[in-house]
Amino acid sequence: MQFKDHPKQYKPKVYLIQEIPGTNKGEPKYNIVGAQKYGEIVTMLPEFSQMIHSPGPLIYKLRTLLKNYTSEDYLLLSGDPAIIGVVCSIVADTTNGRYKLLKWDRQEKTYYPIEINIYQK
């Protein structure tokens, strides 16, 4: 899997790792509409997905879902912490350790982009 840079007309995506709790009941626990200003929201996994004893099939599925991830895209970290860790690992592996995520600020009630470079000293 190769990391891709897209031309300027590319519309970024916000990869929501897991559906927001309560989505299945039609009552999401929190609203992520504010993340749309950073790109189209792409939901990767259903609300109740879990990492199990044999994570191989889930890792394969996540790699497939992230195959078009680019330097312009963002991760929106929601869901099972083990799955979040795997997603960040996959993205870091394909982007030479550089990726962006959205951080919710409770006081300002807005998302802030954070650029991660795991090799930065």
Residue ranges and their predicted role:
Residues L77:
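Short, surface-exposed polybasic-aromatic patches that bind anionic ligands, especially phosphate groups
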